[in-house]
């Protein structure tokens, strides 16, 4: 056999490749959904060949006809690009609580109900990956999947079920094929194979995490028996934008297992107390609530709830059982064993024959009243709960336990809860008011009304009560000004008084105040209102003088700068701390209590869209069809609630190779005019940001990152002294490239913004626009006109070939280059 001549024959038979490039202008006839037929004749010389099968070529794939071949020849597979860089797909699973859904920390999920979790996709490699998707293998107990990415719905592709029809006797495995990679995928019996495809063509190294929000559900399962599913991240095209599995095979990440714990009951305990604290004494009663949530449609029986009341708390009675709609349940349907009325602590035991869950967040609620007395008498001795000399508060912990039967098996659920018992308790509140009195988010120049409530235990009396209020945010200082024109108002003993400047002092830093201190006891003494603040039973344990409570209201203004000179910007927390302190009467011991409020400045928001194609304004749509050679104009709509933000940068990650950043012009073209390809501009209705240092309009710094195919606009630190909202609209235009890529791909073009607050916490948010690629896609068929001639092939035999090229894609193909070669 002549090796070279055999290769020549084989090359003509099956080694043929077509290349398609979409040019801006057609230099040759185009192919648009029609066939192009090429006839060619070749003379074969010095051939010596025997065979008993025919190999032809269809789309550069071998099609074998016949039985066995004695041919033994190398097959050309195309050039292999040597590159050590690679993409590495990675996936993590996050439950509703933000924790990983691991074996040791499974997600507790109600049977017969839906639950939410997230799949977070990353590229941990050092090269761009293409066409990311997730292989999901889920047991049949997971009843459905609803998927979204950046608020856009993604429809899961159900590949099939691993059942008897997919069982491979040879390997002993249940086997399906991934329709994207054509590779085998194995799974447990009766599990289902899904594909969750991101609408992302390329996924660069520095691209933000791609988060899928998943809603699934489970049916009626064995309680406590862990359920698991697996996810495997894949780059379908590996490190290449085109489907070239020989040179760029799919890249798989590590398979991750998510764990779910089926539950039928969840229980928790809470109270009506603000900040979970109370002054002691019967003048400060509160309610405990035992909240039971039962899975939808689940019937539980033989219910016993045992609520262990702390020995520091006195049960007051009045137990009431409510259903999921807040209706009182007939007391004849349950029994309650109550603690002894003259003893602290004890157990409240409720027995209920049965209950059925629904989709409400709470199926049954048990409420009862209690208070913190002076003594713990649960052991028969009167033990003082709060030391009468120091007045130091304590925590009172309680537990609730529930036993029940579900489908003839007994289960248990429990929870613990603590409240804080104090001699002096303080809570703080804040409210933002406009001139009309309407609620409003906090921004610089707003007025904040602060309210401080305080309660004094029935068994204590205090002198020298002082309220110290500090305007302070960690690291940056104060950004508030106490407004003396709004006189502080003190409410106590059922009356109100305005406090003049004799009864408060301000630590001022000029146009900013650091703190204000209010002298409550001094005011009461100077005005002959009271010499000390005494609890209701302090003077006589048998005579109730009523609850000793008070409140203090005052107004502060938010300033544009902090005391350290930095600006109040988006996402900042405007924080206010309060500390009340007083001396226990007839002692030298001081008691204090703290509280605080925080209000957040609104965040920047981002929206991305396509506004024009080839310079013409277009209407909104879910998917934009894009074709090679088109000029696509994108718009970034960025809303700045106060015009002030730190280190603001917005980065647009453009799909590779759909758009090419090379040659992009860094200079703004004419504002208000749709820019031509490779340019950017402010929109005609855009606002502008101002530099924090110079006060001038900011021209953003343009960044070109060819590695990540990313365009960035860096505005740095911005400041609007009047805190006016600003809407910035940026236009930029790119031409759809003629680089080969797949047809009819749903691609997401992602833009991400990042910025910092005043204490350098970084915030990020992203938005996408969806595009549908319309590319040429050629099918190539080559065959010998007369195959009989091959049966008696000899030197000088003429062989005539037909080559047919068909465009099955959605865009015309130009500059068709057809190549064949002999090896």
What are these regions (language model features)?
Residues 2, 38, 59-61:
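Generic short amphipathic/hydrophobic targeting helices enriched at N-termini
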Residues 3-21:
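Sec-dependent N-terminal signal peptides of Gram-positive bacterial secreted proteins and lipoproteins
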Residues 16-34:
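Sec-dependent signal peptide cleavage junction
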Residues 34-38, 42, 69:
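Short, ordered "entry" segments at domain starts
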Residues 44-823:
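Exported/extracytosolic protein signature
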